[in-house]
A protein has these predicted regions:
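Flexible, solvent-exposed loop/hinge segments and secondary-structure transition points
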Residues: 1-177
């Protein structure tokens, strides 16, 4: 008769092997879906582009990746900063003159539903379109004033900071490549 400890160990090993096998089997499909969604988001924030290629450059703090349009239409910068529940990932499109053409929150899955998720809606992100420099509405200085989202301060600040990081990255690149 086997001891309960040995039986439980065998069950755990079989379950772990099954989980690892499932992960290895589904990983290529998940990666393909994620890449397709990222490509669609890039087209959303820079609709005049005909395709994208990655840019090999030194990344600013918070910047995850940079893509340039293959037709010279502009650049898309993906950046992320901590919101209330976790990392908020934002994709920002710039035309060749450095004007923001679109902002899309690509991941805010850990933010509070109903509150933090408001910062992912076009009613918030569309404020950035057409700007070259931004600031929160209660700040002083140059730039387009951006209203925060009441009840979603952390999330709207994360989006704002991510867009500012994208602006800094675009400036570091010297504009569209």
């Amino acid at each position: 008769m086997m001891k309960p400890t040995i039986v439980l160990t065998i069950i755990c090993l079989v379950a772990a092997a099954a989980l690892a096998g499932t992960y290895q089997f589904t990983k290529p499909m998940i990666d393909a879906i994620n890449e397709r969604m990222a490509a669609e988001a890039r087209m959303t924030v820079l609709p005049t582009a005909d395709g994208f290629e990655p840019v090999d450059t030194e990344l600013q703090d918070g910047v995850i990746e940079v893509y340039k349009a293959t037709n010279g239409a502009g650049v898309v910068v993906t950046s992320g900063f901590k919101g209330f529940g976790g990392l908020v990932t934002v994709m920002t499109g710039f035309d060749a003159d450095g004007v923001i053409t679109g902002v899309a929150v690509t991941d805010a899955s850990d933010e509070t539903p109903g509150l933090g998720s408001k910062a992912t809606l076009p009613s918030y992100t569309d404020q950035f379109v057409g700007a070259t420099a931004i600031q929160f509405n209660d700040a002083s200085g140059d730039g387009t004033r951006i209203d925060g989202v009441s009840g979603a301060t952390y999330t709207s600040t994360a989006v704002f900071t991510a867009v500012n990081a994208a602006i800094a990255q675009f400036a570091e690149l010297g504009g569209a490549l």
